[in-house]
Amino acid sequence: MKITFISGQEVSLGTSFLLFSKKIVMNELNQPLLAIIKNVAKTKNLSIEEVVFCLKTALEQAYKKHLNFVNVEVNINFDKGIINVEQLFNVVSDENEDYDDFLEIPLQAANKINSSLQLGDVLRKPIPLKNISSDLINKMIAIFNQKISETNFKAVMSEFSSEVGEVIEAKVEDIDTNKEGGLKGYIINLETTKGYISKRELSKGERLEIGKKYLFVIKEIQRQASLWPITLSRSDTRLLQFLLTSNTPEIENGTIVIKKIERSPGVKSKIAVISNDPAVDPVAAILGPKGEKIRGISEEFNGEIIDIVFWNEDKLKFLINAILPAEVIGYNILQDDERDTSIEVVVPANQIANVFGFKGVNIRLISNLTGWNSVDVYSEKDASEANIKFTRLSFEPEGLFGIKKRREKIISNDATDKVFYTSKDNVIDDEIIVDLAKDLMVDNKQKQPEQVAKQVVEKSQLEKQVTPKEKEKVQPKAKVHSNSHSKKPAKPNQIFSITVDASDKNLKKDQVDNNQTNPQTKQTFDSFDDL
């Protein structure tokens, strides 16, 4: 524990106490020690009295452990800057030969010090601090830090214990880095105390700015926290649920119920929902007009893709809903010791990559969301070669109508370059696809994954399809939570996926190979980032 004075000199608690002990005249507290007491009170949000009590307790316990002083009393007057340490002895009879010289003193010996003492009184013998050892100071500091931590924890628990799991808005005060300068986390100002959010509690790739306010979930209060007891999170699913509820009146009033959320923070989320009113489409209500609501929420999480899925109590139907927009041809529920927990799903060959997602994120989310122990995905050809006898799907997934309408929408003359939506019908206008595709076009000189978008859509074709007036009408405007911070606009891949021809020689080889599950001619990717 250190404090820096105006002179620039940094003084520790131990150093100041040594200075104090060597300059004792009337057991006066020196200025560095007084300053440290004030600083501890300020930074830990404790009163001066609480810090002084911790120092008193630390000194008493250190003396008892170090010098076997069983009965020691410390009195500190902070206002006058005076500290007194005394050893206490019970006055006993001179005839008592078995007295404990650490706790007791014969009457005759006591009267030599104070003639007014009688049997049963307590003799207070001052202990000079000028000869205090560094070992005793180290013990005192360790106990003092422990007592401060315990006192601070009690204060924090009293204020925040009922708020664990709640969402708060708070300002980033400082950044915490390792010796190499790498990010460890951030210190968050909670007004009456501080909170801490580690790097692992952030969305993937997320960086916070000092001085800005963000939304956090109070995850837990740790008694033995090395920094601050309140642990905060932005990767917790409760923050996503809070934003969905705040931005969707139908969730807030109970018409729509969020059944389950699975997240890969900063990458992708899947939310299972159900409507208690047949007239209310839960997916459309959450997405909002032209997807504005969900786009704003996505920006809060560094562009995280958010999929809304129709929940169904039938485990199989729920799985088929979660796999959308990919088409499920058939399935085979494995009959083994884990009956009804594993399933094999058959989809079109060119949609396998889409089902798996980048680095398998999508299939993991699907499995966790729907409760299947494992979900294995095959093309018809692979299923046949593996002698998998599957049952052809005899029902349509919920939410299929809007997807079927847009799945084969062509925006170029090349029949192999197709864009299809994953949203519900009447949520996003057909014109949006043209506008977003144009926004993704980049200069030929830039070597970025977005080059693929230029191969898909020719500028001249876009200009023919959309007039300047129409473009102005369909510009999506993201509705962001009033207190949220967005580092960049929502990615277009929140709205659609693209199918590219893997045989196109202009594509880099690793752009296809890294996403290819089977050597098919055509592969479907979750987003432009996946290419």
Swiss-Prot record:
HAMAP family, alphabetized: NusA_B
SMART domains: KH, S1
CDD domains according to UniProt: KH-II_NusA_rpt1 (cd02134), KH-II_NusA_rpt2 (cd22529)
Biased composition (Polar residues): 513-531
GO molecular function: DNA-binding transcription factor activity; RNA binding
Organism from which the protein derives: Mycoplasma genitalium (strain ATCC 33530 / DSM 19775 / NCTC 10195 / G37) (Mycoplasmoides genitalium)
Stated family: Belongs to the NusA family.
Protein name: Transcription termination/antitermination protein NusA
